[in-house]
Amino acid sequence: MIEVPAPQRAQAAAIQHRLSEGLGRIDPHHRLFGRPVSYRIIDGTTLEITYRDVPGIAEAEVLGVKRLIGAECFCTVAPQTAETVLVRFVVSLK
């Protein structure tokens, strides 16, 4: 198991806090707000945020989440079931 350095742990916690506080304001259709979400730090350098059971997502919502994250990141959307998708944000921790 890799020990996550304190600055990266703090940055990941700050991102998680910003998302939990701000997602309701930028997601009026509740496509992400209230959905199951997981946070995972990979190799101590990358934060992966995965939203499951999302009925769909618009580009404006993705951009809003990226603004909340406040760090360089990218997003992927992948089919989960016939009706839902997985929305994954990958953030570089510095």
Predicted features and spans:
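Short, hydrophobic/π-rich interface segment
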Residues: G44-Q80
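An N-terminal amphipathic alpha-helical segment
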Residues: I2-L47
